[in-house]
Structures are given as C-alpha cells and as structure tokens.
Amino acid sequence: MTTAETKPATETGENAGTTGTAGTAATPEILNLARTKVLENGEPLNYEETLQVLQLGDEHLDELLDLAHQVRLKWCGDAVEMEGIISLQTGGCPEDCHFCAQSGLFESPVRSIQLDIAQLIEAAKQTAKTGATEFCIVAAVKGPDEDLMNQMAKAIAAIQAEVDINIAASIGILTQEQVDRLKELGVHRYNHNLETCKSYFPEVVTTHTWEERTSTLEMVRDAGMEVCCGGIVGMGETVEQRAEFAIDLQNLDPTEVPLNFFDPRPGTPFADLEPMPVNDALRTIGAFRLALPRQLLRFAGGRELTLGDLGAEKGLLGGINAVIVGNYLTTLGRPAERDVDMLGKLQLPIKALNATL
C-alpha cells in the first residue's frame, strides 16, 4: 500500500512557485492564479493546480484558508447547512471497504442492529430542533433489497408526516427502479460516496467497482434528486491521488461533498493507519474548496479526532460551508449545541429550510 506524502516546506514552496523576495513567505504563484481564476471568475482549479495547492508549505496555510473562505462566501454565501444522519441498518455489510467497521467480513466490534420507525421519527425531530435542514437515512448494505426499500418507504412517510425537514438517503448501489422509487417517495438528496480517487479505489474496496458507484450517481442525477458524493482523506493515498480525488468529484459535479477525515476503526484492514496531521487536513479543505468552488463542502466524520475545536473553526473559515451534527455511523461526533455555539461565535448563519427547497 502506498502512504500519504507530506512534503517539507522548503520543497513544497519551490514546487508551488512564489512571488516576492527570497526568505519571505511571499504569496505563492498558485494562490495568485487561484485568486483570479476561482475567486474572481468562479472557475475551478484543474488537477495540476490543485496538486500545487496541496503541496504548499505550512507557512502559506493561513493565506490558503483565507482565500478558500473568500471563494466560499462569494460563490456559496455565508450560510452553513446542517444535517443529521441516522443508521436504519447498522453492521453486517457484505462489502469489504477497508476503513469500515460495519463490514461483516472483519472482526470489528460493531454489531448488526436495526432501528424501528418510532426511533427514526424521534431522531428526525431532534435533528430538526438543532436547525438542521437535512436528515439522512443510512443503511449498511451493498444495495437495498425489497424489504429494505419497503422499510424506507414506511420511514420516509412517517417522518414526512411529523417533521418539517428534507429527507436524504444513503443505501448503497441502486437499480434504476430503486432510484425512481426513492424519487417518488420524496427523497431530496442521495448520498453515495466514491470514498477515494479512482486509481486508489482498488486498494480500499475489492467487492464492487468504482463504476458501480458512479453509475448509481448518474441515475440519481438523471432522476432529479440532488447528488451527494464525497469520501475519506488520509487513508494512505498519495498527495497526487488526493488531487485526483478532488477532480474526480469535480467531474461528477455533485450538490454536496462530504469530507471525512480518516479515523482508524479496530478490526479493519486500515486499523493501523495514522490519522492525518491537522495541517494536511486543513490544506485539503482549502484545496478542495478551490477545486469545488460552488459545492456544499461538508464537515463529516473524523473532524473531532483530526482537527479538534480550533481546527474545526479554521475549517469553517477556510472553505467548509456544511456540517453533520451529532454522532456519525460508527463514531461519536459532538453535541449539536456545540456546533451551533461555534457557528454563532464565528458569526456564520445556519441555512434556513426554505433556502434548501
């Protein structure tokens, strides 16, 4: 397996190019280019440009994050979209995603459970109380069978009857018939993460293909649902593959990109990998914003471990404009109230429900 490359400041500064006198942290040429191309013109960075941003030294990190924040404000506005997620069916998945504790193929401590309708409704109500506009129902499956589709139909109808919130879904690889049914049920947005770039995907998953995932996303878009597609950074990919991943997502043009930071799970093949250094994670946020200037870029799993409170604040002022509140699928998040308080401290408004419809 390859390991992530973190290049020293002296090397990355030369690769990125700078303007100014020697010995100073002059603005790198790539950031000057991005200011014109992305901030002023709204055009995303290409692969080579995104790679240069990812190779910037730490001395340019604050300048990168400031530019990414300006891009986010200009092309997305200042509001932050909040979302809650709930696992309808946890554990026992037949797939071998090497990062995932829900795989039934690994000796992980996650046990297989299912929630009932009453639990889903209560979770949706609690999510709505935080100001969140999205509630995503997730199931640990390769793709849904008829029983799961019927459960989804009952759950969606029950939530819609009692809670004023958009419903999203993430239940794996779909057929055209299943896509059409979810659309009819009122699913607002469908999540199916690529997880990593195409070239690294075979190192992460072997039980299904990249093309199966992208095929589902194309059907979702064609059906008129919003596409939510992101992944995990820090799973051993190289910095070049991280740039490739940003462009893979750019080519899909999703509404939302959830950005997870690798959090090693006991019993999985990736259990011994180290989490990303905080500055690498922040640099990734800035680079992804410059490659995806108009997308919702959402803080997802792993931010508590990788970034902490200070890093999360820097991310929200460095390109992030959406967050998952509460817990994740197999890891603890943090109380939603803390995220609401943080947004207030940063003077970032929460996106209203009517702004998402």
From Swiss-Prot:
Domain called Radical SAM core: residue spans: 78-303
Binding site for [4Fe-4S] cluster: C93, C97, C100
Catalytic activity entry: (4R,5S)-dethiobiotin + (sulfur carrier)-SH + 2 reduced [2Fe-2S]-[ferredoxin] + 2 S-adenosyl-L-methionine = (sulfur carrier)-H + biotin + 2 5'-deoxyadenosine + 2 L-methionine + 2 oxidized [2Fe-2S]-[ferredoxin]
Binding-site positions, [2Fe-2S] cluster: C136, C228, R298
SUPFAM superfamilies assigned to the protein according to its UniProt record, in alphabetical order: Radical SAM enzymes
CDD domains: Radical_SAM (cd01335)
Cofactor comment text: Binds 1 [4Fe-4S] cluster. The cluster is coordinated with 3 cysteines and an exchangeable S-adenosyl-L-methionine. Binds 1 [2Fe-2S] cluster. The cluster is coordinated with 3 cysteines and 1 arginine.
GO terms under biological process: biotin biosynthetic process
EC number: 2.8.1.6
Keywords: 2Fe-2S, 4Fe-4S, Biotin biosynthesis, Iron, Iron-sulfur, Metal-binding, S-adenosyl-L-methionine, Transferase
Pathway(s): Cofactor biosynthesis; biotin biosynthesis; biotin from 7,8-diaminononanoate: step 2/2
Biased composition (Low complexity): 9-27
Pfam family, one: BATS
Summary of subunit composition and partner proteins: Homodimer.
Record-given protein name: Biotin synthase
Source organism: Corynebacterium jeikeium (strain K411)
Gene that encodes it: bioB
